[in-house]
Amino acid sequence: MKKLLLVFILAFSHFSSAQTAKEIIDKNIELSGGLTNWKLLNSVLLQGKVILGIKDEYPIKIYQQRPNLTKTVLTINNKDTAIEGYDGVKGYAMNYATNKLQEYTDYKPESFDNDFIDWENKGFEAKYVGKEKIGNIYCYKVELIKNVNKNIYYFDSKTYMLLREIKKDETLDYSDYKKVGNLAMPFRIESSSPKKDGDYVMLLNKIEINKVFPANIFKF
């Protein structure tokens, strides 16, 4: 009887935590613009500056379009230079040894939507881990698990905005949320990694959504 009761308690706690994780994710989507508006988003142009290391600072533009097209451009010595992208077939990234854009056959493009848009249909399991503090802000900590991959998300417990995302080899901090159309988007993104070799701070001053890009914008 005790064993049966323990199994029931464990099963119920797993169910309730999954429900809680779902509620947190649903609340984030709702308060950041709503699922319909996120699904109506077809393209994004991010503009601002990126700070690399202590002093290196460059103007940056990031073009993104469904389903997974992307292009990142830095302005270096008054010249626009593509440093990374995906044209729908091939991936490209800057080879800093040769200072040339190089094709990468093993390039894995990221989905246009983040993982917690339609996470259930994508095969993820959501787990509510508990509350943790980021700075002075209490956050809901949620894990999204698929096969051996696990990402961790921290949502502000008051606003439900995403403040931190921990991937396998990168941590992203999001802040300075502003309305862009009907959507709430972060205008400050900070990336850090265990190796500290690709850390950056991106400060955006303009985000445009659903622009029609020129046909050649994703050609490299």
Role assignments for model-derived ranges:
Residues L45-K49, V73, Y92, K131, ...:
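Residue-level detector of beta-strand face positions
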Residues Y138-K219:
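Gly/Pro-enriched, hydrophobic low-complexity segments
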Residues L46-V50, I54-D56, I76, Y107-S111, ...:
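Mature soluble domains of exported/periplasmic/lumenal proteins and thiol-rich metal-chelating peptides
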Residues K22-A97:
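N-terminal mature ectodomain segment of secretory-pathway/periplasmic proteins
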Residues Q19-I24, E30, N37, G85-I152, ...:
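Flexible, processing/modification-adjacent segments and terminal tails
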Residues M1-A21:
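Bacterial Sec-dependent N-terminal signal peptides
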Residues E57-K61, T81-I83, L101, I152, ...:
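Well-ordered beta-strand positions in beta-sheet-rich domains
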Residues Q64, G130-K133, D176-K179:
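Short, low-complexity Ser/Thr-rich regulatory SLiMs
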